[in-house]
A protein has these predicted regions:
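Flexible "arm" and connector segments at domain edges
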Residues: 1-60, 64-123
C-alpha cells in the first residue's frame, strides 16, 4: 500500500470523503485542505527556526499526509501524478548528462526537459 493509499484508508475510516473522480470539492472542504497544508508549513518553519530536527521530521511527514488527503478530497491520484512529475524532473539533466543548477542550488531545465502532462490523470 502506498502512502497515498494509506491516507485514503484513514480518510474512509474516519468518515471523510475520498473522491474517485477529479473535481473541485465544496468551499468548506477546499478551505479545510488549504488550512491544513498552511498549518503544517508554519510548523515546519517554526521547527527550522528552532533547529529541532525531530519537529522538522514531524512537520514534513504531516505536510505529506495532509497533501495526500487533499489529493483524495479533490479526487486526484497523487501516486500517478508524482510518477509523471518524477519522470519530468529526471529529464532536466544537461546535454552532458549532468545536472544544471542556478546560484541558489535549484535544478534547472536541460535541453531534453519535458513538461509533465498531468491532464491525462484529470479525467
Amino acid at each position: 500500500m502506498t502512502n497515498f493509499e494509506s491516507v485514503g484508508k484513514f480518510m474512509e475510516t474516519f468518515g471523510q470523503e475520498v473522491k474517485t473522480k477529479p473535481e473541485i470539492p465544496d468551499a468548506k472542504t477546499v478551505e479545510l485542505r488549504i488550512e491544513l497544508i498552511s498549518e503544517e508549513l508554519e510548523e515546519l518553519w517554526d521547527a527550522c527556526k528552532d533547529k529541532d530536527i525531530v519537529s522538522i521530521a514531524d512537520a514534513l511527514t504531516d505536510i505529506l499526509y495532509v497533501t495526500y488527503g487533499a489529493g483524495h478530497a479533490f479526487g486526484i491520484d497523487l501516486d500517478a501524478c508524482f510518477e509523471e512529475v518524477q519522470n519530468s524532473n529526471m529529464s532536466k539533466l544537461g546535454s552532458d548528462g549532468k545536472p544544471i543548477f542556478n546560484d541558489k542550488g535549484k535544478v534547472l531545465k536541460g535541453p531534453n526537459y519535458f513538461k509533465p502532462d498531468l491532464s491525462k490523470y484529470i479525467k
